[in-house]
A protein has these predicted regions:
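Conserved, mostly hydrophobic/aromatic
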Residues: 16, 20, 63, 92, ...
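Glycine-centered loop/turn positions within well-structured domains
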Residues: 22, 123-124, 259, 285
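A short acidic, helix-capping loop that chelates divalent metal ions and anchors anionic groups
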Residues: 32-36, 122-129, 202-206, 286-288
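Radical SAM/AdoMet-radical enzyme domain recognition
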Residues: 40-63, 70-192
């Protein structure tokens, strides 16, 4: 369906957990408490929302977290979403640490593509950023990308990480050195490497994003024959470039310095069941209250269990979900205001909103 600005909204991101096995400094550093288990949607609740979304024209769903594979039932959810009429693509964004373990299950479930979040290929810096020594686990999947039946993309946040490196043997690894090392993955493997400007939300406010105008200028100096790649790579806002000898492409997602709000096609669903139509604003439509109408929170914190015999396609339930979701989509803000920090009203961290 179209929002009030006439934009076609056909893409939804489902955050299925706020838990993660890494502790990235700009997202979920040590010391953050996870939300109560009961607050997180059950698989059937995601399914019910996806059915309503599909009836409104949502065709593509990205499963995210937190780290979605921290939820062992992630492959089951992918299969459930793929079986919904109208949902054409289901993809996954993961930090890649457990991807090799779950890859066969995800492919059997019908997963269409995978994005791996990876900000550096330097082992020491990786551990500084994430708090974990897990780079080798991530590289296992990237190194066999050529043999996979689905596209693989690498997402790297554009930050000057030197502020994390004081006292390490890689202290001073410059943005130029870091982005080039990551970009080389697209040369060695058939993967698209996308650099993403840091969203000034939550802990991300402490880190200054690298201007993608600077990055593109340096890319052109490093790869003189770099040219725009007009091939369709997905359904996101990245602008892609290709250099000779590269198996993959390099993409720039420039939310700050290349504002693309006029063509934004997405809304987000948090793991708590709130629809967010723009990352910049602390506004959301509560779908969980519709799904759990009349049910009381238990005294003990346990996972919410969908009631046996309750139909996710119940027409009254679906009507309420469609009405609330349609309102959230229609009222999507015209644009973010990330370039004006004083006007940003979103106070939550990305880990609780969803990547």
């Amino acid at each position: 369906m179209k929002d009030r600005m006439g934009r076609e909204i056909d893409y939804m991101r489902f955050s299925i957990t706020d838990r993660c096995n890494l502790r990235c400094k700009y997202c979920m550093p040590d010391g953050i408490d996870c939300m109560p288990r009961w607050d997180v949607l059950a698989l059937e609740e995601f399914e019910a929302i996806a059915i309503a979304a599909a009836s409104l024209g949502i065709k593509k769903i990205k499963v995210t977290g937190g780290e979605p594979l921290a939820r062992k039932s992630c492959p089951q959810l992918v299969k459930m979403l793929k079986n919904i009429p109208g949902i054409e693509k289901v993809t996954l964004t993961t930090n890649g640490v457990q991807l090799a373990q779950y890859l066969d299950q995800l492919l059997d479930a019908g997963l269409d593509a995978v994005n791996i979040s990876l900000d550096t290929v330097d082992p020491v810096l990786y551990e500084k950023i994430t708090g974990r020594d897990k780079l080798s686990e991530v590289m296992k999947v990237i190194e066999k990308a050529e043999d996979l039946p689905v596209p693989v993309k690498i997402n790297a946040v554009s930050i000057d990480f030197r502020q994390l490196q004081t006292g390490t043997k890689t202290a001073g690894l410059s943005p130029q050195e870091n982005w080039q090392q990551v970009a080389e993955l697209a040369k060695r493997y058939p993967v698209d490497v996308r650099f993403i400007e840091m969203m000034p939300i939550g802990y991300g406010r402490q880190f200054k994003t690298i201007d993608h105008n600077w990055l593109l200028e340096n890319m052109k100096k490093t790869y003189p024959d770099l040219a725009v790649d007009s091939t369709v790579h997905g359904f996101g806002p990245a602008v892609y470039y290709k250099a000779s000898g590269f198996k993959g492409s390099i993409g720039l997602i420039s939310a700050i310095h290349g504002k693309f709000c006029s063509s934004c096609n997405r809304v987000r669903l948090t793991s708590q069941g709130h629809v967010k139509s723009c990352l910049c604003y602390d506004e959301g439509t509560d779908l969980r209250s519709i799904l759990r109408e009349g049910q009381e929170r238990p005294e003990e914190d346990t996972h919410y269990i969908w009631q046996a015999g309750r139909d996710v396609r119940d027409e009254k339930l679906q009507e309420k979900l469609r009405e609330a979701l349609a309102r959230a989509i229609y009222e999507k803000p015209a644009a973010h205001c990330f370039e004006k920090p004083g006007e940003i009203t979103e106070a939550h961290n990305m880990i609780s909103i969803g990547g």
